[in-house]
From Swiss-Prot:
GO molecular function: identical protein binding
Species name: Homo sapiens
The name this protein goes by in its record: Centrosomal protein 20
The family this protein is said to belong to: Belongs to the CEP43 family.
Tissue/organ expression: Widely expressed. Detected in brain, heart, kidney, liver, lung, skeletal muscle, placenta and intestine.
Cross-referenced PANTHER family: CENTROSOMAL PROTEIN 20, FGFR1 ONCOGENE PARTNER/LISH DOMAIN-CONTAINING PROTEIN
Record's subunit section: Homooligomer; probably required for localization to centrosomes. Forms a complex with KIAA0753/OFIP and OFD1; within this complex may stabilize the interaction between OFD1 and KIAA0753/OFIP. Interacts with PCM1; this interaction may be mediated by KIAA0753/OFIP. Interacts with PLK1 in later G1, S, G2 and M phases of the cell cycle; this interaction recruits PLK1 to centrosomes.
Key words of the record: Cell projection, Cilium biogenesis/degradation, Cytoplasm, Cytoskeleton, Phosphoprotein
Length: 174
């Protein structure tokens, strides 16, 4: 017969494999934060830049279903509960959407823009080449149950290995 310690270990392993344990931990962290958060204490007002940055992050978090992380961001930063209009964000960032697919977060388009470089062909030195890839491919891999790349990007990567050929629905207009 199994001991209590063995049963705990099997239960923990099973919950980790199913991704439930991480979900539960995130939910508990979010609930603890909400319980400790003092609503009576006024939040400092957000600068325009922080409002935009937080909204880009929220859009990314919600797209990737990090809903508890997004709820903590909103509560902690003082970001409005109602998301900013996407067209407002695009206008404020001087960005444009390359396609009608507006389901992909603007951050993906911004990242793709800097990975491709600027219009005149000058590449961003901070994001170019080997600095993005560790010399040992096993380095930098997360021991997560999540796929290393989002499903929507993985499908596109199979079609093309060149980042410029990936379908990205937004790019920054400079």
């Amino acid at each position: 017969m199994a001991t209590v310690a063995e049963l705990k270990a099997v239960l923990k392993d099973t919950l980790e494999k199913k991704g439930v344990l991480g979900h539960l931990k995130a939910r508990i962290r979010a609930e603890v934060f909400n319980a400790l958060d003092d609503d009576r204490e006024p939040r400092p007002s957000l600068s325009h830049e922080n409002l935009l940055i937080n909204e880009l992050i929220r859009e990314y978090l919600e797209f990737n279903k990090y809903k508890y992380t997004a709820s903590v961001l909103i509560a902690e930063s003082g970001q409005p509960v109602v998301p900013l209009d996407r067209q407002f964000l695009i206008h404020e960032l001087n960005a444009f959407e390359e396609s009608k697919d507006n389901t992909i977060p603007l951050l993906y388009g911004i990242l793709a823009h800097f990975l491709r470089g600027t219009k005149d062909g000058i590449q961003n030195a901070f994001l170019k080449g080997p600095s993005l890839q560790p010399s040992d491919p096993s380095l930098g891999r997360q021991p997560s149950r999540r796929k290393p790349m989002d499903d929507h990007l993985r499908k596109e990567e199979q079609k093309s290995t060149n980042i410029e050929d990936l379908h990205v629905s937004q790019a920054v207009n400079r």
